[in-house]
Amino acid sequence: SDDNVSMENGLKFHIDWLKGQKTGFFVDQRDNRSLVERYSKGKNVLNMFCYTGGFSVYAMRGEAKLVHSVDSSAKAVDLVNANMELNFPGDARHEAYAEDAFKYLDRMTVPYDLIILDPPAFAKHKDALRNAIRGYTKLNAKAFEKIQPGGILFTFSCSQAVNKDQFRMAVFTAAAMSGRSVRILHQLHQ
């Protein structure tokens, strides 16, 4: 229903206020979604762990050539498709897949120019820190291996136990493992 639709920067989103993760929509990512929009023009965009598809919807408005949204939850894929239909009815530039992120990255054949990694928390407490850093390193390495030369990676950590320096080190380690040189364009916050 319309009372479950929220507006952000002129875009509409279905929100599940009762059963959604946290608030049902991550408002702390608003500025980062706008940044994705700015970089998307003419690009093949992959949004991993898409949930509501916020980044995907912004990439579409940013005139991406195509946008693929991936989430392990079929419910999330239904939600991103509903949000696309709300904003870009019938637009064939978007496809969504209910699939494990690592499996999708292994099998993907599309040459992506921009990849967004916004996974759920890998560590909610200090005891899980080592495994979380390993997970972030592995995930980012896989993205670096697959992204086109000159591509842009938006990568996020919402793990409270992982600080900014540890996350940055995981990303740079992933780049080195993949044989890719990287530079930070923006230090994002959420």
Kindly label every feature range from the protein language model:
Residues K75-I116:
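S-adenosyl-L-methionine
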Residues I152-Q190:
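C-terminal catalytic and target-recognition region of SAM-dependent MTase-like enzymes
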Residues Y112-K142:
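Mobile active-site "lid"/loop adjacent to the S-adenosyl-L-methionine
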Residues L66-D71:
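Conserved SAM-binding motif I beta-strand of class I
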Residues S1-F26:
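Non-catalytic substrate-recognition/targeting regions of SAM-dependent transferases
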Residues I147-P149:
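Helix-to-beta-strand junctions that scaffold the AdoMet/dcAdoMet cofactor pocket
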Residues G42-Y51:
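Conserved class I S-adenosyl-L-methionine
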Residues T52-K65:
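Conserved SAM-binding loop of SAM-dependent methyltransferases across substrates and taxa
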